[in-house]
Design a protein with these regions (language model features):
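A SIS-like phosphosugar-recognition module
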Residues: 1-327
Length: 327
């Protein structure tokens, strides 16, 4: 397997700039759910490039434009930078304004967008269309957009890694196989919809305070679950790193959605220990874990197992459980 992106998506001059180390900084930007997808995409690209020469980060578009740039910047102050904007509608003011500002400082620009011929598509050098739902619509449910944005970011990152010689054809083939497995994995999670609904109906009203937690790539899952729970349930909900939660507000005895699927072996033991602490403080842990993982059982109020996938792709499956629980 290989990736094929034409020049309307990623042009040769950007690839050459990456290959020759003319681009050293790569930012994924967006707002809201697109900003969370940016976080997941940055984690994936860091894994794919696997090169400390690159500084790869995700920022809210408004943070990049508001606090990482100044009116005193020179016209080439970001000439070593690639900015990849993510937007469902292509009309998000903060994101589009940020693209204008980085271009004015010499940055190269790409976009991952759902709506064809939207404003942002005329501002950037290359566009990957996600086409979730009807891509002529201004608004498409951001649940669908979120998953496709992450996969688009993965394909883009994989292409960059291969084109610059940082990953070989064997690696690319295995990663594409993993991406192709995701729809079947997601269908398997959707098959648990009734059990997830039963959990939400049984537990949601028992706790005043809710939280979502995740660490590493799964912090993106926690952040996105928090957004949907807040939107759907009209509640202010926290999103924290798993290890940090015990230092924050366990005295409130919250209901905690723990995004643990895909966590690597060196970390999962600590997440289990932290979950035991949550339980000891009379919190209500609802766990999302890999199939076959039984060590959470003594501490989980409910546990949902998802198919095993790589750590960098696991946010998709963790988030899907959280989305269903929220609905």
């Amino acid at each position: 397997f290989t990736t094929v992106l034409d020049s309307t998506m990623l042009n040769a001059s950007i690839i050459e700039a990456l290959r020759c180390d003319q681009i050293r900084r790569i930012y994924f930007v967006g707002q809201g759910t697109a900003g969370i997808a940016a976080q997941a995409c940055a984690d994936i690209l860091s894994y794919y490039l696997n090169d400390s020469k690159f500084f790869i980060d995700a920022l809210k578009a408004s943070e990049l434009s508001g606090f990482k740039m100044s009116t005193h910047d020179s016209p080439d102050s970001m000439s070593d930078t690639l900015v990849i904007a993510i937007s469902q509608s292509g009309t998000t003011t903060d994101t589009n304004r940020t693209v204008d500002m980085v271009r004015g400082r010499g940055a190269r620009t790409l976009a991952i967008v759902n709506r064809r011929d939207s404003d942002i598509t005329f501002k950037v050098e290359g566009v990957m269309y996600t086409s979730s739902g009807r891509d002529i619509e201004m608004s498409v449910a951001s649940t669908k957009a979120f998953y496709s944005q992450i996969v688009a970011g993965a394909i883009l990152g994989l292409h960059m890694a291969a084109a610059t010689g940082r990953r070989d054809i064997t690696f690319v083939t295995e990663e594409i196989k993993k991406l192709l497995e995701l729809p079947a994995h997601m269908k398997k999670v959707l098959g648990q919809a009734k059990a997830i609904e039963a959990s939400a109906r049984r537990l949601a009203a028992t706790k005043t305070y809710w939280a979502a937690v995740g660490s590493g790539p799964n912090k993106a899952s926690a952040d996105e679950i928090r957004i949907k729970l807040s939107e759907l349930c009209y509640k202010t909900i926290s999103s924290d790193y798993v290890e940090d939660k015990k230092h924050i507000d366990l005295s409130s005895e919250p209901l905690i959605l723990v995004c643990a699927a895909g966590a690597k072996s060196s970390v999962i033991g600590d997440i289990i220990k932290d979950t035991a602490i949550f339980k000891a403080h009379k919190a209500t842990p609802v766990i999302i874990a890999d199939e076959g993982e039984t060590r959470f059982d003594p501490y989980a109020e409910d546990i949902f197992h998802v198919p095993v996938t790589s750590e960098h792709l696991a946010p998709i499956l963790n988030t899907l459980v959280g989305h269903l629980w929220g609905y």
